[in-house]
Amino acid sequence: MENIEQRVKKIVAEQLGVNESEIKNESSFVDDLGADSLDTVELVMALEEEFECEIPDEEAEKITTVQQAIDYVNAHLKK
């Protein structure tokens, strides 16, 4: 089973069409990985689906880097 970090990076790569090797934890979805606002919405939806959690809009707006996505999932994952 892949860990959360690997799963988040895989989703980011698939959603944004970037190579997984280019994705660093500190990568910004918009500044480093070229995401636009629609990409970020779709990315949040993909994370919600993968991890079976709901990310409220006000929380989703705060998730701007790969590490923030990993941290959010770790904190809110259904145990």
Curated annotation (Swiss-Prot):
The keyword Cytoplasm applies. Pathway: Lipid metabolism; fatty acid biosynthesis. The modification O-(pantetheine 4'-phosphoryl)serine is found at S37. The keyword Lipid biosynthesis applies. It is found in: Cytoplasm. 4'-phosphopantetheine is transferred from CoA to a specific serine of apo-ACP by AcpS. This modification is essential for activity because fatty acids are bound in thioester linkage to the sulfhydryl of the prosthetic group. GO terms for molecular function: acyl binding; acyl carrier activity. Keywords: Cytoplasm, Fatty acid biosynthesis, Fatty acid metabolism, Lipid biosynthesis, Lipid metabolism, Phosphopantetheine, Phosphoprotein. Gene3D superfamilies: ACP-like. Residues 2-77 form the Carrier domain. InterPro entries: ACP (IPR003231), ACP-like_sf (IPR036736), PP-bd_ACP (IPR009081), Ppantetheine_attach_site (IPR006162). GO terms for biological process: lipid A biosynthetic process. One of its GO terms (cellular component) is cytosol. HAMAP family: Acyl_carrier. Carrier of the growing fatty acid chain in fatty acid biosynthesis. Belongs to the acyl carrier protein (ACP) family. This is Acyl carrier protein.
